[in-house]
């Protein structure tokens, strides 16, 4: 009994750290999971951009959550392959959890609705300690694509809309920031500004919201705001993805911005989905 699952990356429109409400939009980078059911045990490999990744906490948490949800007792052999860099704010954990939940359910021969799969993945992420808010916004955008605005305190999808596949430039600095390192940080000082950004996104002005969110969180977390300023001067719409350090921009001239941003770090061009 084998199964396959696939889920994508996303970038942040509004980070939920400060208020519990957030939003993200899907981009065209992917994580794939293949599983084989076995009697017991959990073994396998995780490869991220060709490099081995040894942290299996999330895999073990997904297995535990699915066992509880289905009442099935099983082990797995797994193979996870991802295009999404880890610790950059590009929703690698959400994509891995979603893909693995889908793969295990397929192997079990049980159908699962997308929102239920997302909720199980979020539960696993909380169990594994790889999220602060539960990241229901990130997980929704990862699996469903498009723009997803959510209340992470209730795991509730408030709004979803399709987006055009416009170009996205990613700026991916060398350093990584694991979400667990931010636990206990008090974000209340920026909550009023992030509330305004979220309300703006709910009204349909999500591009404006992501710029405000990016500037506020960059200043608060100590990231440079120069990449956003550079993008704005070129007519792009730019923000900080998640906790960073990755930035992203929507632009009609991705090659131009990619060249400008290359002085800050590695860049890639992808698209919304």
Curated annotation (Swiss-Prot):
Molecular function in Gene Ontology: ATP binding; shikimate kinase activity
Keywords in alphabetical order: Amino-acid biosynthesis, Aromatic amino acid biosynthesis, ATP-binding, Cytoplasm, Kinase, Nucleotide-binding, Transferase
Predominant cellular place of this UniProt entry's protein: cytoplasm
This enzyme's EC code(s): 2.7.1.71
Keyword Kinase: yes
Catalytic activity of the protein: shikimate + ATP = 3-phosphoshikimate + ADP + H(+)
Family: Belongs to the GHMP kinase family. Archaeal shikimate kinase subfamily.
Protein name in UniProt: Shikimate kinase
Cellular compartment(s): Cytoplasm
GO CC annotations, alphabetized: cytoplasm
GO BP: amino acid biosynthetic process; aromatic amino acid family biosynthetic process; chorismate biosynthetic process
């Amino acid at each position: 009994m084998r199964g396959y699952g696939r889920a994508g990356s996303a970038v942040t429109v509004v980070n939920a750290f400060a208020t519990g409400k957030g939003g993200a939009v899907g981009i065209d980078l992917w994580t794939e999971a293949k599983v084989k059911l076995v009697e017991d045990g959990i073994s396998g490999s995780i490869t991220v951009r060709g490099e081995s990744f040894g942290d299996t906490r999330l895999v073990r948490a997904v297995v535990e959550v699915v066992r509880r949800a289905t009442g099935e007792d099983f082990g797995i052999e797994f193979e996870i392959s991802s295009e999404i860099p880890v610790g950059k704010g590009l929703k690698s954990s959400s994509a891995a959890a979603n893909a693995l939940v889908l793969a295990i359910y397929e192997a079990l021969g049980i159908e699962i609705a997308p929102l239920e799969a997302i909720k199980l993945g979020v539960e696993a992420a909380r169990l594994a300690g790889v999220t602060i808010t539960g990241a229901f916004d990130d997980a929704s955008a990862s699996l469903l694509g498009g723009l997803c605005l959510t209340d992470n305190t209730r795991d509730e999808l408030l709004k979803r809309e399709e987006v055009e596949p416009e170009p996205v430039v990613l700026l991916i600095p060398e350093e990584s920031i694991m979400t667990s390192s931010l636990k206990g940080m008090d974000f209340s000082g920026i909550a009023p500004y992030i509330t305004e950004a979220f309300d703006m996104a709910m009204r349909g002005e999500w591009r404006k919201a992501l710029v405000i969110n990016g500037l506020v969180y960059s200043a608060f977390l100590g990231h440079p705001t120069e990449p956003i300023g550079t993008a704005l001067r070129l007519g792009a719409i730019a923000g900080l993805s998640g906790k960073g350090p990755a930035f992203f921009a929507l632009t009609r001239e991705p090659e131009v911005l990619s060249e400008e941003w290359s002085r800050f770090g590695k860049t890639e061009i992808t698209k919304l989905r």
